[in-house]
Amino acid sequence: MDLTDLTSTDTEPASPAPPPGLVAGVDTHQDTHTLAVLTAQGAVIATSSFPADQQGYNDLTAHLDRLGPLMAVGVEGTSSYGAGLTRTLRQAGYDTVEVLRPSRRVRRHHGKPDPIDTIAAARTVLSGDGVSQAKDTTGPAEQLRLLLAARTRLISAATAITNSIHSLLTTAPEPLRERYRRLDTPALITRLARTRPTRTITTPQQAATSALHHMARTHQDLHHRAERLNQQMHHILTTHYPGLLAVYGAGTTVATQLAVTAGGNPGRIHNETAFAHLCATAPIPASSGKTTRHRLNPGGDRRANAALHRIALVRLRHDPTTKNYANRRTQEGKTTKEIIRCLKRAIAREVYRALTQPPPTDTTSTLAAHRKRHHLTQTDVAHALNTYPARISDIENHRRPLPQLTHRYHQYLTTLDTQ
């Protein structure tokens, strides 16, 4: 559709100048962004469209500068098509907020041309209903988002290849099926990657061997690349989000997802209840008659909810305190699903504190240096704490959250300091 201005915006506003307290709304698309500027009373001052590139962002910002002081700019899709514009507006000093898409009622009555969506976005900013502080996409959280997105695609591709290998083996010649029948998936991938298929294909068995070999090698390459991304994410987490890694049950990918959900400015989330709603763990009353029950919010970020779910499962398996809690709640008549829901709500509270409150300075990142000052090896510490050297390595490198052992490790080194 050919976008045209409803009001001329190519020249300076005619006198008298528009009153102060303007708001703006932007409807973002892949190729163009449409802007609308409204007065505090809701009257439309101007609408215009700009290319969705850096020059267009600069032109849009300059256009806003000419119109006068703005209370806020509402942008649809600040984490998708509007990400670049949001960064430019923030750098220019504009209060930029995320605007939810127009309601279906608005679109049913007024249609869906871009100026209508843009004006609706600006009026949403005026009402204050359906807006939130936009995520900061210029810091470590954005770095983690990009790395996590790539890793997720690599793992998905590796899973698809695994399924294809099993499917091909199902119809492969019997000698191949018999050779690999009893191998689990990791051993199967390793064996297939080590095979040496012939250069010339003359039989179905040779063709199957070659196909399986190349898929297995690709599977290994995908996992190696995913592991390199994992190491990069871990380094960013260690530097900027050590509190998340200290959460019991939060590995690198889980901690990364929670950091991405919160964004680079977690302070935009007003409190831990709002964070629980964001992660879809806030209980919603679902009582009926004499039964008092709660259910979870079906909305929110499902990937963050899945991350909290994984933490809950880890704690149910390995954390004595969580096991005791689960046993007590079971005796009270709670089901396993209800117990996990309660756990996820408590974990969301813990994660919010890890995101918004700085961790203590003496964390596991300093334990290795502390140990070396006493000229101790990881094996020496492991023997003293009656554990394995690998567990000490896990603690020092943030590979595995072990809070109880970490506390004992810290106490052991503190005792050595006093001797």
Residue spans of the language-model regions?
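Short glycine-rich, Thr/Ser-proximal phosphate-binding strand/loop in the N-terminal lobe
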Residues: 31-55
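Phosphate-backbone recognition surface of nucleic-acid-processing proteins
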Residues: 57, 246, 252-336, 397, ...
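Short alpha-helical DNA-recognition segment
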Residues: 375-393
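A short, Lys/Arg-rich alpha-helix, primarily the initiator
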Residues: 353-373
